[in-house]
Amino acid sequence: MVLSPADKTNVKTTWDKLGGHAGEYGGEALERTFTAFPTTKTYFPHFDLSHGSAQVKAHGKKVADALTTAVAHMDDLPGALSALSDLHAYKLRVDPVNFKLLSHCLLVTLACHHPAEFTPAVHASLDKFFSAVSTVLTSKYR
């Protein structure tokens, strides 16, 4: 999926507005994913998955940091996310559907925290961006 110049602007502008909260939102979205889609917990048997878990928050920050990298490299997502793609495809073997589930929970989390900024255009742009990131992360499964 190709991001238009307007999509890129929407994503960058929205991500910039998150400020220091990206890691917090990443943790919240990950917790939301585990709650709404319990099968996603199978990849984290060594984690404390309870509400407010430090491990979930730390992993959520990693997710947010990876997305921050992706936002900074929207014109070269495959290059920017190559190592992460290798990790998820070859070592962790995460079912690709889980990226879609987490993307949905990220959209919900961002909409809850920034309802005024979460216009239909921004929603569509973020959805396309998360889809593009998911496609890159699953590209090495083939």
Curated annotation (Swiss-Prot):
Q: What is this protein called?
A: Hemoglobin subunit alpha-2
Family in the record:
Belongs to the globin family.
Where does the Globin domain start and stop, copy by copy? Answer: 2-142
- Recorded source organism is Arctocephalus galapagoensis
Which GO molecular-function terms appear in the entry? haptoglobin binding; heme binding; iron ion binding; organic acid binding; oxygen binding; oxygen carrier activity; peroxidase activity
Give a brief account of the tissues where this protein occurs.
Red blood cells.
Q: Under the cellular component aspect of Gene Ontology, which terms does the record hold? A: blood microparticle; haptoglobin-hemoglobin complex; hemoglobin complex
Q: Which residues form the signal peptide?
A: none
- Subunit note: Heterotetramer of two alpha chains and two beta chains.
* Pfam families the UniProt entry points to: Globin (PF00042)
Q: Which GO terms describe its biological process?
A: hydrogen peroxide catabolic process
Residue positions annotated to bind heme b are 88
Gene3D superfamilies on file: Globins
